[in-house]
Amino acid sequence: MSPIEKSSKLENVCYDIRGPVLKEAKRLEEEGNKVLKLNIGNPAPFGFDAPDEILVDVIRNLPTAQGYCDSKGLYSARKAIMQHYQARGMRDVTVEDIYIGNGVSELIVQAMQALLNSGDEMLVPAPDYPLWTAAVSLSSGKAVHYLCDESSDWFPDLDDIRAKITPRTRGIVIINPNNPTGAVYSKELLMEIVEIARQHNLIIFADEIYDKILYDDAEHHSIAPLAPDLLTITFNGLSKTYRVAGFRQGWMVLNGPKKHAKGYIEGLEMLASMRLCANVPAQHAIQTALGGYQSISEFITPGGRLYEQRNRAWELINDIPGVSCVKPRGALYMFPKIDAKRFNIHDDQKMVLDFLLQEKVLLVQGTAFNWPWPDHFRIVTLPRVDDIELSLSKFARFLSGYHQL
């Protein structure tokens, strides 16, 4: 019998956050080992519970949420999203401009599939959240990575963006606040990106899932209100700010001129209809989440868990010889730099795997985020301080004797 192979469409699709290193971690756990996980931004396992009022409203609406809804989502949920963004400067957004999906991930894939033809290019940051690159590849497009500059607080390199635009470039992806670096972009930088998009007729895809997870004096500026004359698609959801990643509730909001994008919008509506609708019971969480008390503020200010965990992780990382890190101003991650020459690192996945096998701590290698060099890794700052201290003390011990062959 001939082997059954995966589709050739998946040849360039990669999502190493849940890749071979995670499989090895699962094997270790099955053998009875405890693995400290600093690899994925899933708040619930780290003791971040959802607000009670969200759970109560979902439970209360369960009896009437057993059937399909509109393929774009419940009217009440989309109305709440519309009002949320109108109050933030997107005055012309209507209910029909909003699509609710099974998490932002599903919507990213739909947005790329509806737009890209074979060989079309999409500007994606390096490092990136790798689903963006995977979605572009799955949609027959080509992800062209523009560099973010570590020496400038991980802001995008505007000259590199300009240099990588070609006649095939359809759009640009902006992840702000950024995963994996924790950068929060200034209004001035965003205005410059808008001008580049304007000059080259690019669609802006704005991934803003961490827009309320900000530290110190950081301020988030949504890019869509800065570009009312451009088609901008903003992605957000409940997973991070409201700690309900398992609910799989995300949305995308179309803003700007849409008459010239009728064909693209038809494609989005077709893909939304093909999967019928997003999870209906969990959509009842959206109105409550956006309209109620924003409890995330308790975690991101001094004394709050996210604030204190970020600070402690940053201090400990920078105390490790050969490792340095830009202090994140938002999101749930850090993207430290490791002195590859000092440790002779030429394969960062091997480094992460070696660390896992020796110390039973799970990280993600930097190249998993489409960073071109094997000199970074990502950690999440969700674990409690005790676990962060234990994990990073193990990493310091590991590196003290590490040298790749």
Curated annotation (Swiss-Prot):
Entry keyword set: Amino-acid biosynthesis, Aminotransferase, Cytoplasm, Pyridoxal phosphate, Transferase
Entry's family note: Belongs to the class-I pyridoxal-phosphate-dependent aminotransferase family.
Subunit and interaction comment: Homodimer.
UniProt cross-references to InterPro entries, sorted A to Z: Ala_Aminotransferase, Aminotransferase_I/II_large, PyrdxlP-dep_Trfase, PyrdxlP-dep_Trfase_major, PyrdxlP-dep_Trfase_small
Taxonomic superkingdom: Bacteria
Pathway linked to the protein: Amino-acid biosynthesis; L-alanine biosynthesis
This protein's name: Glutamate-pyruvate aminotransferase AlaA
An annotated GO BP: DNA damage response
Induction behaviour: Modestly repressed by alanine and leucine via Lrp.
Pfam family membership, one: Aminotran_1_2
Organism: Escherichia coli (strain K12)
